[in-house]
Amino acid sequence: MKKSLELKLQQMLERYEEVGRLLSEASIIADQNQFKSLSKEYAQLEPVSQCYESYLEAKNNLDSLNELLESDDKDLATMAEEEIDTVKKQIEELDEQLQWHLIPKDPDDERNIYLEVRAGTGGDEAAIFAGDLFRMYSRYAESQGWQIELISASHGEHGGYKEIIAKISGQAVYSQLKFESGAHRVQRVPETESQGRVHTSACTVAIMPEVDEINDIQINPDDLRIDTYRSSGAGGQHVNKTDSAIRITHIPTGVVVECQDERSQHKNRAKAMSLLKTRLLDAEVSKQKQEQAQTRKSLVGTGDRSERIRTYNFPQGRLTDHRINLTIYQLSDIMEGNLSLVIDPLKREYHAELLADLGRHD
């Protein structure tokens, strides 16, 4: 472990012990605001501090065992030799846990997300691939126990979607899917291709963390134009009898959102407003990320949807993620929702990137 990281851990442990002492003082207990604030800090410091204490204890054990190896007592030396590998492995595991604890936490990691998949270049084939991508994300979401809620969909003429937007809710959704924003390129032989030639088309994916109602973005009602229209698509006899679908335009930015999934106009309006707030906040965050990217390139990227991040080559059964030069020959598994094959290496690389930054700045 780097000296700079060990120094940071030592400071955190000292602060943890100090806060523990403060919480037992009568003056702190009497002040509810201060007590609440310190209790929160103590809870945040506790996991990493306890882990660091275990790490220090294991290192002390290793030092003691190394001394016993030099002992004249052969039984003690043999016992030390048997235990030393176990303790070394324990230190390695604790070291890994500590590094994970030190990684700065993304405040959005626990949030639900809005997923947008749009067909790009490639016409009908791009729309079909957009449908395949949405199915892949849906399968992955189901495997994680997440809920998927359709917001709006524009169907392709020969299957798939020109655009589809859905909300995915569950535990730490953004932390898993935040690496998916960007351009996804597909190389395959379309079903309509009689010559067997490989075509290249593309889709763009956007992952936006849901706006927290507590930290709501303020929208002036005068800045909105709200239109109602009749839903299209599945819905049986109810379809086209009422103008239940909603389109909201944010006039200053030109951002347009639609929702046609619910039969109730009120519900569609609420969903559309939630999506609009998320889009506006996402635009602001993307702008900030682009400014930050001038000094440091991040694996999550700038949020630029035109940035090509991945290629899906069906004839070769190959997926390539261009950001970390990752190539996997398990494309069919991934398209069936086994997205962890891609997400896990991306997360490891991202965490390594954050740790390297941490070491440089401390």
UniProtKB/Swiss-Prot annotation:
Residues modified as N5-methylglutamine: Q237
GO molecular function list: translation release factor activity, codon specific
UniProt keyword terms in alphabetical order: Cytoplasm, Methylation, Protein biosynthesis
Any one GO CC term of the record: cytoplasm
Main location: cytoplasm
Post-translational modification: Methylated by PrmC. Methylation increases the termination efficiency of RF1.
Coiled coil: none
Residues of the signal peptide: none
InterPro entries the UniProt entry points to: PCRF (IPR005139), Pep_chain_release_fac_I (IPR000352), Pep_chain_release_fac_I_sf (IPR045853), Prokaryotic/Mito_RF (IPR050057), RF-1 (IPR004373)
Cellular compartments annotated: Cytoplasm
Stated family: Belongs to the prokaryotic/mitochondrial release factor family.
UniProt function note: Peptide chain release factor 1 directs the termination of translation in response to the peptide chain termination codons UAG and UAA.
Alphabetical list of NCBIfam families matching this protein: prfA, PRK00591.1
Protein name per the record: Peptide chain release factor 1
